[in-house]
Curated annotation (Swiss-Prot):
Keywords of this entry: Ribonucleoprotein, Ribosomal protein, RNA-binding, rRNA-binding
Pfam families: Ribosomal_S20p
Function: Binds directly to 16S ribosomal RNA.
Family: Belongs to the bacterial ribosomal protein bS20 family.
Protein name in UniProt: Small ribosomal subunit protein bS20
Organism name: Mycoplasma mobile (strain ATCC 43663 / 163K / NCTC 11711)
Gene Ontology CC: cytosol; small ribosomal subunit
Gene3D superfamilies per UniProt: Ribosomal protein S20 (1.20.58.110)
Keyword Disulfide bond: no
Domain of life the protein comes from: Bacteria
SUPFAM superfamilies reported in the protein's UniProt record: Ribosomal protein S20
HAMAP family according to UniProt: Ribosomal_bS20
Record GO terms (molecular function): small ribosomal subunit rRNA binding; structural constituent of ribosome
GO biological process: translation
Length: 91
């Protein structure tokens, strides 16, 4: 354990941030999985789930959990996956 008071405070704040970031990352992963599952099952609320996933991803950027390029890559890959699956079933 740290001997300096400011270091003890940093340890506590780092732990709070770690827990908060882990929860947000989990929320993002879950939203992406839900959207992908809906795409694969050709669910009627795919558009809403994609919109929700993009919203969660963008929120994680504003909270500082992900870098904006990382979030853009996640969103782009999700959209590309949706486009690929929808075009595959259309043919």
């Amino acid at each position: 354990m740290a001997n300096i008071k400011s270091k003890e405070k940093r340890i506590l704040t780092n732990e709070k941030a770690r827990v908060r970031n882990a929860a947000m990352k989990s929320h993002v992963r879950l939203a992406i999985k839900k959207a992908k599952r809906a795409i694969e099952e050709k669910n009627e609320n795919v558009e809403q789930l994609l919109k929700d996933a993009h919203k969660v991803i963008n929120t994680s950027v504003s909270h500082g959990v992900f870098h904006r390029n990382n979030a853009a890559r996640k969103s782009s890959r999700l959209d590309a996956y949706a486009f690929k699956i929808q075009n595959k079933t259309a043919n």
